[in-house]
């Protein structure tokens, strides 16, 4: 079992946030260029803890947000949602009590319908409600590791279809993005994926985009996905 508790960091402070995942990072200002040494430790903390929280930051300008994101790799642009003017990599979310929809109402892995899904997502919060509106996270390493060895072996040989048309069609019409302007990608991914850097295995299915396990009948697929 992977245990990140003994990791030592020299340029940042890392405080474990919860037993199963997440850590709070202090000692770094994301509104400025992050040093190579600090970034290396942030990347290591990301691999160790999966979700990182940077509290009480100065506002991060869009260009700095994009610059920091590019340190992790090529940035993804959302195939359907309207993006920030001048920054196609940034997807702005506005929701109030009167909004017809709120992004991410159900458990999902962001844009898993893409052929090459994003490594992760960077959120910068500007206006928060006094209560509610929580963003929740789940550790899919632990989800896999909690399964019996027989079920792990069974799932390891399967693939799943991830689709987006049922999610994206009509979703952004009230924000000036017509269906004719969007892409609705579809992809097939292994049900169990191995992280290329940590070597850990994780479940890679979700309620929002995963529509079928391909090697099973429709009824068998439904039963497994609803477990």
PLM feature segments, named:
Residues 1-227:
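Non-heme Fe(II) oxygenase catalytic core, chiefly the N-lobe of the double-stranded beta-helix
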